[in-house]
Regions:
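Conserved active-site and SAM-binding loop architecture
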Residues: 1-151
Length: 151
């Protein structure tokens, strides 16, 4: 006997034949991606926005563990500092670090490069306050289904 739930009656079934591109706003460690993975939904980690660097490091470790690319290899230490400042990274999830804080001895060059590499590996737009609609690069909507989540 088939079982039916009230959700079957309340919500229409959604199906797509197009590949799913996931955009996670306030991504944290990627719970939405984990849910899709656990449900067996094939998807692409397309973009995310998370400014808290510990969460970004966790996201990368969970979802992009095989990406050990050094995206900062061709950059000077100064270039990395400027990039992180411009992106508006945070370590407390409440306010962005200032250039002086990023530059300080509290954060080593290795830490700054790891942050930058994690951002690039996770396709992270970082600070949602500085994003615009075009930054989401939602194109080819006839070819892809874009799923945007926030938490």
């Amino acid at each position: 006997m088939d079982q039916i739930s009230m959700f079957d009656l309340m919500y229409p079934t959604f199906k797509t034949n197009n590949p799913v591109r996931l955009i996670e706003l306030f991504a944290g460690v990627g719970s939405q991606a984990m849910a899709l993975r656990n449900l067996g939904v094939p998807f692409e980690h397309y973009l995310m926005s998370e400014w808290e660097m510990h969460a970004t490091a966790s996201y990368k470790a969970i979802h992009m563990a095989d990406d050990d690319t050094d995206y900062s290899a061709e950059m000077s230490s100064e270039d990395v500092i400027q990039a992180l400042t411009q992106l508006g990274i945070s370590v407390d999830g409440k306010k962005p670090l200032t250039e002086e804080q990023i530059r300080s001895h509290s954060y080593s060059d290795a830490w700054r490069r790891e942050c930058y590499n994690n951002i690039k590996a996770t396709h992270n737009l970082v600070n949602i306050c500085s994003m615009r609609g075009g930054d989401l690069a939602i194109t080819n909507t006839d070819r892809y289904t874009y799923l945007m989540t926030y938490s």
